[in-house]
Amino acid sequence: MSPSEQQVNELVRQIVEAVHPLRIILFGSAARGEAGPESDIDVMVVMPEGTNHIETLGFLHTQLHGLGFGVDIVVVTPQELARYGDDIGFVYHDALREGKELYAAAA
């Protein structure tokens, strides 16, 4: 089942509460308005430099289990976005080009 706006907002709330990201960006079919009944949600979670990607991803999957829809998460740092964001071969490029920012931490 394709998630509603309320469910996406709940996803964002849970991610923010769990790992305190710098940004959360929705990308993929949901960001393009093309999500179907079987679509998952693709989110890029921008974390501070020095973050352990694997630990953060594992923790998020544990925290987000049971949402009722699929979530694909990409964990990235600002330095990685700056370095690879313009490279067409990286998912970062697509996320930055077509994505919608759902959350930005206060500066």
Placement of each model-derived feature along the sequence:
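Glycine-rich beta-strand-to-loop/alpha-helix junction loops that act as flexible
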Residues: 27-29
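Catalytic core of pol beta-like nucleotidyltransferases
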Residues: 1-23, 32-37, 48-107
